[in-house]
Amino acid sequence: MDFKYDVIVIGAGHAGCEAAAAAANLGSKTCLITMDMNKIGQMSCNPAVGGIAKGQIVREIDALGGYMGLVTDRTAIQFRMLNRSKGPAMWSPRAQCDRAKFIWEWRAVLENTPNLHIWQDTVEELIIENGEVTGLVTCWGVTFHAKCIVLTAGTFLNGLMHIGHKMLAGGRCAEPASYHLTESITRHGITSGRMKTGTPVRIDARSVHFDMMETQDGENDFHRFSYISEPRKLKQLQCWTCYTNEEVHEVLRSGLADSPLFNGQIQSIGPRYCPSIKTKIVTSPDKPQHQLFLEPEGESTHELYLNGFSSSLPMDIQIEALKRIPCFKDLVIYRPGYAIEYDYFDPTQLKHTLESKVIKNLFFAGQVNGTTGYEEAGGQGIVAGINAHINCHGGEPFVLGRDEAYIGVLIDDLVTKGVDEPYRMFTSRAEYRILLRQDDADMRLTERAYKLGLVKQDRYEMLLKKQAEINRIVEFTQTYSIKADKINDALETLGTARLTHGCKLIDLIGRPQITIENIAPHVPAFMEQLNKIEERKDEIIEAAEIRIKYKGYIDRERMIADKIHRLESIRIKGKFDYANLQSLSTEARQKLIKIDPETLAQASRIPGISPSDINVLLVLLGR
């Protein structure tokens, strides 16, 4: 067997799967090394994909030719579009998935990807020569050689699990940790740290009193994660909600002395936006209840996931506390919740391509960069895989801007600001979120993927056809005139003001009460135009309506983004000796030396860099 590859990806989680698929589909001879081929794409925590901002990332991965969206659609057991009551910039798709099917769907994708080989083993050491990674050695003693390596090891690097005072080595429940790999990297000047995450108890559905819970149903309209998924009705299994109470909190408080988070056993930092139940009761002592979500793990299992009850308290405390909730009075569990500590690497030592600034041709993606979440990992993975291929075969680095994708925001935040806690994406982190909607990820990114070779001709033509149809609908509304006497009765029925004189159709659709769907039956010529749409009709109509209703906001945000682009075009890397620029503040000098930003715009986003510091650099550049 030949153990020489263009690209090797270490770890087959969500980052690793996307990285390996991207590199291989672009033509690189690729090897994906995993400790367990039966855990490829494992959902280590909740059996769900998407959510606020995360759903947008999955759509972006799909638009770039990745697979997370397709795998999710094929294994979904409930779909919802979150934040529908808000504007479309906030709409976020989310799906419950069948955990077991998700793994096997990912495995089928990867096993059928040309240029990709899967190897089951544990990597112990990277081979680094003259500041460049050239290969690796596994625990079986196999030496691999590679032009580029992508590290996507998740929580497995020196992983340590906690339940009460009990500590157990492992990267996930009943799975061994990976040792020595961190040390083989840090000895070359890369900085590592420790972070913590956790997962909740898993429950036997047969022990739950569902009649004491509220149901949470799915939705069955046209929305999906993938732009190329086959249109089909997704299965819609129920989820349920319930609440903790003061009795639950009392039991939890009684166990705090045995909590590894509060007795000093765990020193590392956990995710702020996914706190454990014990953190909730400590930080919000006056809150009488906390909402919990009970989610199915799959179609053919009794196992349920209790979202909102992450805990590393002793098992007996977890069970006793839950039994104080009426619906869980006869509770039976499959396994308790636990916390896990793991190694991560300082992401400010990375380029925007996710290649290390310290070790050439070594890329990092996923939780090893200090992020949390399947979606954040997948987004980093596809970018790392693309750039690893480019490093092997030549080409311009692939970098996504903050106005192009949530993935661009994510990576820029990591490499520019760094992390002091597990990083989770939110819509509030994106300054151009009206430009980064879930409905238009394909129109933002698929052409770039096509030029790379990651998206094929037929998909690109499908995009062009969609864009043409949207343009046709919008242009019709701009030119078609409406007479007041012909439409006023309909407007009154729809709860909006009557016209005093004629107007263009686009002006009517701009009203809050009017949609394309409810106005079209009253405008036969418009209905005729809509009926000409042959494929993806609902998707095209929604996109056209968003463009019409939010044109002013979209144009304004685009103008602001274009102004910032001027700073993005001013390259400063290698132009200054920051240590000797006394006109900069001490903090600015320290931060600029550490981050070594590529552009003036990136410098302006570094915490501690003031507008006056940017003005100093502009003056020195002669601008």
Label each PLM-derived region with a short phrase.
Residues 377-398:
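Internal hydrophobic alpha-helix adjacent to the cofactor/substrate pocket in enzyme cavities
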